[in-house]
Amino acid sequence: MFELFTALMLGILEGITEFLPVSSTGHLLIAEHWLGSRSDFFNIVIQAGAILAITFVFRKRVWSLATGLDKYSNRDYVMKLATAFLITAVVGLAVRKANWQLPETIQPIAWALIIGGIWILIAESVAKHLPERENVTWSVAIAVGLAQVVAGVFPGTSRSASTIFLAMLLGLSKRSAAAEFSFLVGIPTMFSASSYACFELFKRGELLHENWLEVSVAFVAAMLTGFAVVKWLLGYIKNHSFAPFAYYRIALGLVLLTWLT
């Protein structure tokens, strides 16, 4: 029963942190440090739950882009989404081939949380002095693609933080526009990464000993929580900055470093 409860808690944690600029991978690694580590498949599945949630949130936007390619603005936007995704895919595969491993200790995650928090504060400070723009440029698309790889390589960085705030610094200063592009790029990116990882685990026969009840509970928890969090966040950023998330990251990082010493 305790294992089922921890699976539920990890699913909720994934749903809360996946799309907030606080790093879901970092939080999961921290939680598993105390609750016990889970299989790669478990972590992949709960991330898939969060991805499904954001796909549902943006279903109308995705449909309008897919069915409106006769409009230049839609074609241009889709091409930039595709460019960001392809950059992530190519560079990400190269990193995977190099056998990059996630850290097994908390210290690098703590530092990534602190540095990421400072990064958010800098981006917010710079962006508020820029004219409000919501058009995605090619430089933003390329940078977002690379930022996704950085976030995957360094847990604690946060995919949403690295992509949203880099986009803001490069001129996409309207928070909602930067967040939308980040989230839409994240859909194919995370679906592809999850599918590839699942296929690799299947080939190695590592799916035979999973506790499917725990996996299912965590998946549903991540999906429902993720849906609620994204809906809340999209409303929140219309009139608020991301600064509170920055302070949270810095505080958590400092607490972890203090605990480690």
From Swiss-Prot:
Localisation per UniProt entry: Cell inner membrane
GO CC annotation: plasma membrane
Family matches, as InterPro entries: UppP
Keywords in alphabetical order: Antibiotic resistance, Cell inner membrane, Cell membrane, Cell shape, Cell wall biogenesis/degradation, Hydrolase, Membrane, Peptidoglycan synthesis, Transmembrane, Transmembrane helix
GO molecular function ontology, one term from the record: undecaprenyl-diphosphatase activity
Note: Bacitracin is thought to be involved in the inhibition of peptidoglycan synthesis by sequestering undecaprenyl diphosphate, thereby reducing the pool of lipid carrier available.
Family: Belongs to the UppP family.
Listed name of the protein: Undecaprenyl-diphosphatase
Source organism of the structure: Xylella fastidiosa (strain 9a5c)
